[in-house]
Amino acid sequence: MREWRWSDPGQPFTPFRARNASMSDLIETAQRAATIAVLVENEAGVLARVIGLFSGRGYNIDSLTVAPVDEAGRLSRITVVTTGTEMVIEQIKAQLDRLVPVHKVADLTLEGPHLTRELALIKVVSRGEPRQEALRLADAFRARVVDATTESFVFEMTGSGEKLDAFINLMRPIGLAEVSRTGAVAIARGTSALQP
C-alpha cells in the first residue's frame, strides 16, 4: 500500500511515494525514446496493422518511415520512433513480433551504436540581408539549395533530428515558410544487420 503525506503543511498537497518506494517502481515510470526497426512482408495492409497496434493501445508514434529493402521487393523495413516506459516499449516490441507478416523486430537504441538520419525540405522566403544570412547558415549546416527564386529558397538537408531542428529554428526569424520532413531512418553501426 502506498503512503502519501504532505512535505510541508504550508504548501499545496503534492503526492509522493514515501519510504516504501522501490527502485523498480521508479524505473517503471521513466520514459525513454526508442528507435524500433521492423522487417515485414511488403504486402497491402501491413502498415495499417502496425499503425493499428499503436493507435489501438494509445501509444504515440513520433516518427514513421517505410520502404522496400530487397531486390525482389518482397520485404519492407519500417522504422518507428516512439516514447514510453521500458515496460511499454517491451510490450510494443512483443506485440509487433506477434503480427503475422513481421519477420524481425529490433530496438536499435538498445542493441548498440546506430545511425539515425532525417531528410528535410525547408522553404525560406526573404529579401535583402536576411536572404544572405539564410545562405550563410545553410552553408554552415551543409544544406543544399534545391530551388531558388528572387524571394525564396528551398533547402535540402540531411542529418540528425537535432541538427534539423537547430537549422529550422535559425530560419524562423529569417522567413521560414514551410517544412517537410521524412521522419527518422536508422541502421546499426558495424557488422550487425537486420535480416529475416
At which residue positions do the language-model features occur?
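Tryptophan (W) side chains
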Residues: W4-W6
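Long, contiguous binding/interaction regions
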Residues: F13-L39, E43-S76, V81-P196
